[in-house]
Amino acid sequence: MKKTIALLLSAALLLTAARPASAQSTEPSKENFPSTETTLSQIGQAEAHPNAKHSRMADTSALAAPVKRPGLVRRIIDYYSRSNVDRTFEKKIDWSIAPGPNYSSDVGFGIGFLLAGLYRLDRTDSVTAPSNISIYGNFTTKKFVLLRFSRDNIYNKNKQRLSYSGAFVYFPGAFYGVGYQAGKEGYAQDLTTTMGIFRISYCTSLVGRFYVGVSGGIDYTGAKYKNSGMVEYMQKIDDNEIAKPGGQIGEMYDLWKDGKRYDPEKQDPFSNFIAATGDKPNAFNTNIGLFAQYDTRDVTFNASKGVFVKFEAKWYPEWLGNTRRTFGRFTLTLDYYLKLWKGAVLAYDLYADATAGTPSWHMYAKMGGMERMRGYYEGRYRDKRLIETQFELRQKIYRRHGIVGWIGGGQVWGTDRFRWGNTLCSFGCGYRFEFKNKMNIRLDYGWGNFGNRNLPWDRKRSSAFLFTASEAF
């Protein structure tokens, strides 16, 4: 199972051909538009066709004739052809909206939407970059639900920034266990999680592009699960109490008897983890933190040049409401962007995540998702320590359209020892469409390592479609 959302762009988005506006000024934070953000569409009031021209006529009755309103298709094309123009000096909030039908084997068919707005707190200030707000949602046939909002307020010629975001997630997913070996073995237990998340941060410039700030967050995760009963079922087959079935179950029985290539005792990794650690399925975590960052990027959500470095330390004390424990978390992000030839950018990303103490089961560092190690189910590989790196080549090919290709690698360790042989790879390609000024909608397809080929459900190479707004990093 791979937790990703594949979204197919609507044909209306692909019909546009307006030139992108110039880049915005540097903003002082790594926080992109939410990594899961894209689209449902709302067309504003109809306007006369932009190519329509009024000429003076001798017949005065012609002057009184009503102007023909453009059709729906023409209005959609006109709307998106103007959507990447910076209108933040004209409007209080420059809203855009777009649809996102999607499909994934993990979550089924779905409808997603993105409502995104750019605005300036002072419309007479051309130095400070625009602030932004976004609301994203996705609903699928397999009952996956995601609702998320974020807002970034930029002040005082980019010297201060206040950011906050929240999300609600209902996800019928899977748990593979903790540690590299657990992820490699591929035993997954169905696990339905309900998550509520809130984040807030504030940073200010000390010297030039060097910023320091404070942060806070609240996480709640509730889990529902049940045992597969596979140990008892296999034993009944072995004791001839029931006949051996055909299909996948029969194959699993043969694998169990043939050299223990299948172990039914590992079929319920979440139940085993809870029993072994005494952890609680439902966990509440709050944190306070400090961070420092250096940022020379030209645009935060679609950089073409510059450097971004951020170190953050978070503390989760038990007295602040954390479930039965106190632990710390440390993250490091390093991004570098270099213009190559016309329309080409080489982007590099390095990310490290480590915990001190023992976190709740859902707070371990997780590999995979929509930004790093694309192609892996997020959380299949999780542990106390994680490191990931990737190179991505981005090439604009025609006006607002572009393509990318990337290659990367990563590791998790802590429960298991660090070994170079445990390194996982990620590679893929994608399409880009400039939806708003310097903001891309991206459609990626990523691949990873093969799963456990002994298991009938895990023999293919890990892969995933991804669709969201803004670049991965």
In which residue ranges do the predicted regions lie?
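Residues that define the transmembrane beta-barrel architecture of outer-membrane proteins
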Residues: I93-W95, V107-I111, A129-S131, K143-L147, ...
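Sequence/structural signature of outer-membrane beta-barrel proteins
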Residues: L118-D122, Y136-K142, V169-G173, T221-A223, ...
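C-terminal outer-membrane beta-barrel translocator/porin domains of Gram-negative envelope proteins
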Residues: G278, I288-Q293, R297-Y398, W406-G409, ...
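Transmembrane beta-barrel domains of outer membrane proteins
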Residues: A116-L118, D152-I154, S201-S205, S215, ...
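Outer-membrane beta-barrel initiation region
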Residues: T38-S163, I242-S304, D383-K384, Q395-I397, ...
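Outer-membrane beta-barrel "beta-signal"
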Residues: M370, Y431-F435, M439, L443, ...
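Transmembrane beta-barrel strands of outer-membrane/channel proteins
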Residues: P101, F113-L115, I133-F139, F149, ...
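Outer-membrane beta-barrel translocator domains and adjoining extracellular loop/strand segments
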Residues: G112-F113, S126-T128, L147-S150, A174-A182, ...
